[in-house]
């Protein structure tokens, strides 16, 4: 029962308790009664959060049971700022891929081919995060591989089959489920051919890896040991068909913008010749003109590019986009640190100009959104060190001067109305 009688006086004589978390009616705002149980407002909110998360993963489906591109992009917008064109390309490609799988068993004259995806964009612009969010929306197994650790079979390093093994592990060794998963291969620009001409010596971590990836990306039955690698050659192998696995490759491709710009320049002589100024466009703007031939010049082999028919380029993030990333998404950095401070019963607030200064610092570092956390850690380090031992602090305020390093955070105490700047120390 959730009703307790006590002998400590009238207040505790008929105290009611939540049947789920055990809190009394005095500890919560509302206690809702059922036939034999009680539930508090906090447990109701928790249940609603769980239901919302489940609804998000299942989403509103189209007639064939696949999320529509509009549904996919709507959820992507909640987590990833900007990159509208890349989101549109991704949402259509993923929708078509899983629609193809939904109709695979039906008889038809036209066989739909798989469309793997190549993401190209500056570092820290959201390539990896887009792929992770996509897998969460579709609710399929997802794994991420680093192309720089891959080598040809027989050499020290990871085999490409290890990627399929990781996918199988994320599917709890359910082969059927793994065969519908998503694989994201990061840093794919680092496996480019070391020179334009085929070399007589083996390039085991560059072109060799591209050759090894061809078959699993196109579709093959990979033999995967349950415990990985070449360590247990005697054990029985699992057979995983990669035909329906969606491969997304991503890379920063530093210097690719120069290749694109050079292709766009046409030299002419004589009186009608136009004088070209140096291309001063941002990297993201130049990348919009990307063609497969540019990736071949960069060092990817034509067969590899042919397995990635969908090309999506991402913009480099400007100041406004970085400010949005700091504060707007559901798991924004500011919200994460505010939650951390809430655990100490302290409110954390940032001035608008402080956020702008943080964004400027990230742009100077050329690390994109990835550099925001390290900047935040540096700003809040001393405060997070001192806070657990300070008493009475109600609020911490971060200004532009604090971000620049010329001032300390402002501490506002609960037991005093005056504001105290922790300037000396």
From Swiss-Prot:
Residues 6-59 form the ClpX-type ZB domain. Keywords: ATP-binding, Chaperone, Metal-binding, Nucleotide-binding, Zinc. One of its GO terms (biological process) is proteolysis involved in protein catabolic process. GO terms for molecular function: ATP binding; ATP hydrolysis activity; ATP-dependent protein folding chaperone; protein dimerization activity; unfolded protein binding; zinc ion binding. Coiled coil: none annotated. GO terms for cellular component: HslUV protease complex. ATP binds at residues 122-129. Zn(2+) binds at residues 18, 21, 40, 43. It comes from the Bacteria. Belongs to the ClpX chaperone family. Component of the ClpX-ClpP complex. Forms a hexameric ring that, in the presence of ATP, binds to fourteen ClpP subunits assembled into a disk-like structure with a central cavity, resembling the structure of eukaryotic proteasomes. ATP-dependent specificity component of the Clp protease. It directs the protease to specific substrates. Can perform chaperone functions in the absence of ClpP. This is ATP-dependent Clp protease ATP-binding subunit ClpX. The gene is clpX.
């Amino acid at each position: 029962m959730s009703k307790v009688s006590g002998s400590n006086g009238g207040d505790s004589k008929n105290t009611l308790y939540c049947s789920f978390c055990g809190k009394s009616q005095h500890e919560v705002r509302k206690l809702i009664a059922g036939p034999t149980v009680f539930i508090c407002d906090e447990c109701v909110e928790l249940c609603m959060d769980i239901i919302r998360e489940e609804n998000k993963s299942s989403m509103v489906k189209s007639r064939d049971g696949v999320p529509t591109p509009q549904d996919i992009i709507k959820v992507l917008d909640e987590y990833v700022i900007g990159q509208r064109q890349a989101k549109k390309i991704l949402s259509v490609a993923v929708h078509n891929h899983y629609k193809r799988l939904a109709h695979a068993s039906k008889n038809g004259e036209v066989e739909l081919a798989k469309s793997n995806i190549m993401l190209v964009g500056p570092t820290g612009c959201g390539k990896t995060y887009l792929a992770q969010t996509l897998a969460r929306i579709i609710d399929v197994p997802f794994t991420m591989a680093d192309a720089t650790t891959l080598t040809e079979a027989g050499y020290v390093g990871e085999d490409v089959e290890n990627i399929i093994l990781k996918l199988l592990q994320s599917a709890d060794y359910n082969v059927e489920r793994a065969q519908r998963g998503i694989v994201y291969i990061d840093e794919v620009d680092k496996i480019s051919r070391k020179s334009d001409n085929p070399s007589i010596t083996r390039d085991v971590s560059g072109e060799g890896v591209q050759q090894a990836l061809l078959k699993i990306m196109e579709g093959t039955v990979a033999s995967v040991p349950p415990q990985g690698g070449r360590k247990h050659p005697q054990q029985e192998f699992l057979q995983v068909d990669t035909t329906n696995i969606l491969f997304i490759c991503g890379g920063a491709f530093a210097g690719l913008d120069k290749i694109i710009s050079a292709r766009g320049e046409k030299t002419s002589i004589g009186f009608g010749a136009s004088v070209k100024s140096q291309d001063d466009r941002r990297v993201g703007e130049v990348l919009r003109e990307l063609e497969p031939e540019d990736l071949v010049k960069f060092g990817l082999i034509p067969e590899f590019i042919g397995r990635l028919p969908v090309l999506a380029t991402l913009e480099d993030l400007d100041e406004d986009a970085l400010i949005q990333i700091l504060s707007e998404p559901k798991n924004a950095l500011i919200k994460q640190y505010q939650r951390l401070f809430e655990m100490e019963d302290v409110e954390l607030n940032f001035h608008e100009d402080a956020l702008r200064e943080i964004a400027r610092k990230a742009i100077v570092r050329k690390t994109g959104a990835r550099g925001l956390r390290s900047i935040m850690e540096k700003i809040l380090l001393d405060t997070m060190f001192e806070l657990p031992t300070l008493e009475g602090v109600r609020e911490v305020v971060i200004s532009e001067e604090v971000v620049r390093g010329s001032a300390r955070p402002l501490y506002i105490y609960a037991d005093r109305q005056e504001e105290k700047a922790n300037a000396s120390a």
